[in-house]
Amino acid sequence: ETGLTFKIIGAKEEARLATIGCHDLIEPKAASVLVVDIGGGSTELSWVDARAARENGFKGLLERAPILDWTSLPLGVVTLSEAFSHLDEVEAYPLMLDHARQTIAEWPGIAAVRDAMAESEAHMIGTSGTVTCLAGVHLKLDRYRRDKVDGTWLSQEDGLAAIKLLRDVGMEGRMKLPTIGDERAGLMLSGCAIVDAVWEACPAGRMRVADRGLREGLLLSMMYGPKKPKPRRRGRRGRKPSQTQTGAENQKGTQDGG
């Protein structure tokens, strides 16, 4: 009825677009970056060659994002929360954390990420409501402000302190926090468990907070990415004349000749 055509993208394309959306948050001296995109049903981890991203420039990034490795984990704030919804949140959090920890450990690429983080050659970019809310809590904002959150840095110590606060205040306390509110309060702990597990896997990693990601990557790709050639329309010379046109031309020729 609307005339709109929808396209379902795969996990790899989602990882690519999230990387494009966050490209200008890559630190100039970084050798590589882990983009952590936490969604409702999955979490995409993209290990990006930061040097290649700088050398190739924005256009090169659009044509081919220099992703060294990536994975789509069956972990999301909704699915993880639902899996342990039968438990009190105090009981549920350690179990959610353990489940997230085990799932991340199954990705073979995590070892290379951990080594690079330990050598201080890499950092993380976190793009999700969970990460932006954690930043808002850490910054003690009286309301959510994108200009303060987007691009700010979270150390592991600061991030875990914010997670502890959210666990300690409980559901009602989270609902009263101005940067979380009613809508996100129920899903914050499952998202925190995922972030917590990522930091456990990469303990030396700093995380840059991104209030941007997949949507912005999609828009940038549509606006500036390689354009698909449009199908050529046949000109008038290429058209086969209709019977009506032929008859009219024959009649005109007879009149001109008589």
Where are these regions (language model features)?
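Helical "lid/coupling" subdomains associated with nucleotide-phosphate turnover
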Residues: 1-32, 47, 55-57, 64-244, ...
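Catalytic cores of RNA-modifying enzymes
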Residues: 36-38
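Acidic, divalent-metal-coordinating active-site segment for phosphoryl/phosphodiester hydrolysis
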Residues: 40-47
